[in-house]
Amino acid sequence: EEVIMNPNTEIVDAIKKSIPLKYALVKNAQVIKLLPDDKNGPLHQRWIMEIENGLTITVFYNVDIAERVPIDVGSYVDVAGELEYGDRWKDPIMHWTHDDPQGQRKAGYVILNGTTYGQATGP
């Protein structure tokens, strides 16, 4: 019998223990809800993705730095970025899901249908 490994096991374990990860890669997560853009500071596109049996992460993606991701509910995405927790959010969040213009962090990204988003479009 073939055993299918969950590619998100490390992230699931971190979330269950509320451990932040400076760089995490979530693979093949389903977008379950689109949220209004976050306009506090730089403009961020936001969505909620499910990584396993009801376990969700809210994604913040800076559209001032990189082009908007053309996602819909039901889309499957790979997302790389920083995993954090906070009193302001119900779910764990992923941010820095795009290039860091200052180059101080490993570049995050979003992959949708084989296309990578999150590369810097500015100077």
Give the residues covered by each predicted segment.
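OB-fold and OB-like single-stranded nucleic-acid-recognition modules
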Residues: 1-123
